[in-house]
């Protein structure tokens, strides 16, 4: 089924609702499956060091397939690419459920996620236009964060009840995402006729990297989003060590609740950005980025639970307000230069590389015996300074 003129600019069109529903189910499955698979590793007495390997193979798939997934998203109707990617996730979850090696199964999920990302964001620019693209990004980010919240909690609760049942429910959720993809209109291919030989494909990707990096606005967006997501993943791990040190609470639930506060804040911030920021006023988001670092600094010095909750909600609001306009800017500029799919693939490479780099630096700091509170203060200060530098550079440009 094709929509006339290829786009329906309404945020509540059938196509947008199908994309948002598929994204919610897919992200819900990703987060529920992570905690269900971690429970499986514990139940089968895998060593503790094996648990972070799950996240590593997931992120590694993004980096390994970065040169290819953007072209896939731009060479086929994006709704069908999303359906194929969710089918890979379904296969990975089902294989874990039926007793196959969980790392191999989770790698399949990671490959599916890598293929899914350029298509899910790239299709927004084909279903909406102009300033509605910012609002569409806000809707997508809000749906994603809600899925992260609910999926994480559901994965843990279901795994405590029955690990295999939790894995099976994850597979059913992915199946629901596949069905939702069927309702996305078949849109025209963005960049038909590209070569599928290895060398031209990699050359095309790295050419897209060069084109986006040489453009001041897209370089600005790439750096900003990469720093944000690298910092977000690092903060998640920082909380695990910070809670017992700063609050004297040793349970496993409290860090999860604190992470949830950040996610709630991001939903609010994403909604505010959709209403207050346009593609012409993207720089309005930069003070929020600086204040994220300041918020982390003050949060690290807290010794009571209530102000910690409040500061993390505030950090989340600032984060949502910061990331949504930068995503929209990259999609809009990328669509007219290298294709939206290639632009998002380049963005994924930057973000996941930043995640690995920041987590590596954090791990080195912990291994060196630096106090967790000091790490948090330094991390917040460095992030604020980095975003300030990015803002100054952009203003001078």
Swiss-Prot record:
One Pfam family linked to the record: MFS_1
GO molecular function annotation: lysophospholipid:sodium symporter activity
Keywords: Cell inner membrane, Cell membrane, Lipid transport, Membrane, Transmembrane, Transmembrane helix, Transport
Topology class, membrane: Multi-pass membrane protein
Record GO cellular component, one term: plasma membrane
Localization in the cell: Cell inner membrane
Transmembrane residue ranges: 21-41, 53-73, 91-111, 139-159, 164-184, 229-249, 257-277, 281-301, 304-324, 344-364, 372-392
Any coiled-coil regions, as ranges: none
SUPFAM superfamilies: MFS general substrate transporter
NCBIfam families xrefs: PRK11195.1
Annotated function: Catalyzes the facilitated diffusion of 2-acyl-glycero-3-phosphoethanolamine (2-acyl-GPE) into the cell.
Family membership: Belongs to the major facilitator superfamily. LplT (TC 2.A.1.42) family.
Name of the protein in question: Lysophospholipid transporter LplT
Species per Swiss-Prot/TrEMBL record: Enterobacter sp. (strain 638)
Gene: lplT
């Amino acid at each position: 089924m094709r929509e006339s003129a290829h786009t329906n600019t309404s945020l509540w069109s059938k196509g947008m609702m199908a994309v948002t529903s598929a994204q919610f189910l897919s992200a819900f499955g990703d987060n529920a499956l992570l905690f269900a698979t971690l429970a499986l590793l514990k139940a089968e007495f895998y060593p503790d060091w094996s648990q972070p390997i799950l996240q590593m193979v997931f992120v590694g798939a993004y980096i390994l397939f970065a040169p290819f997934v953007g072209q896939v998203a731009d060479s086929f109707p994006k709704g069908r690419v999303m359906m194929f990617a969710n089918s890979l996730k379904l296969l990975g979850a089902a294989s874990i459920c039926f007793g196959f090696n969980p790392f191999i199964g989770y790698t399949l999920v990671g490959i599916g996620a890598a293929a899914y990302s350029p298509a899910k964001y790239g299709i927004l620019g084909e279903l909406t236009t102009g300033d509605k693209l910012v609002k569409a990004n806000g809707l997508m980010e809000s749906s994603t964060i809600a899925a992260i919240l609910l999926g994480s909690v559901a994965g843990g609760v279901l795994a405590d009840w029955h690990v295999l049942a939790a894995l099976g429910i994850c597979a059913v959720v992915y199946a629901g995402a596949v069905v939702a993809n069927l309702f996305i209109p078949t849109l025209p291919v963005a960049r038909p006729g590209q070569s599928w030989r290895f060398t031209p494909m990699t050359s095309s990707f790295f050419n897209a990297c060069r084109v986006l990096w040489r453009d001041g606005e897209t370089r600005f967006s790439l750096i900003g989003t990469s720093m944000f997501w690298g910092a977000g993943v690092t903060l998640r791990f920082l909380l695990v060590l910070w809670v017992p040190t700063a609050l004297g609470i040793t349970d496993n639930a409290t860090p999860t609740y604190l992470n949830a506060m950040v996610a709630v804040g991001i939903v609010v911030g994403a909604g505010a950005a959709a209403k207050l920021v346009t593609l012409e006023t993207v720089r309005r988001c930069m003070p929020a980025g600086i204040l994220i670092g300041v918020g982390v600094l003050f949060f690290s010095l807290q010794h009571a639970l209530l102000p910690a909750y409040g500061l993390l909600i505030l950090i989340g609001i600032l984060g949502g307000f910061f990331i949504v306009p930068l995503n929209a800017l990259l999609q809009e500029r990328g669509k007219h230069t290298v294709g939206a799919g290639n632009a998002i693939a380049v963005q994924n490479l930057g973000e996941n590389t930043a995640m690995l780099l920041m987590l590596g630096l954090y791990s080195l700091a912990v291994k060196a015996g630096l106090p967790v509170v000091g790490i948090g203060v330094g991390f917040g200060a460095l992030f604020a300074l980095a975003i300030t530098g990015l803002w100054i550079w952009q203003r001078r440009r």
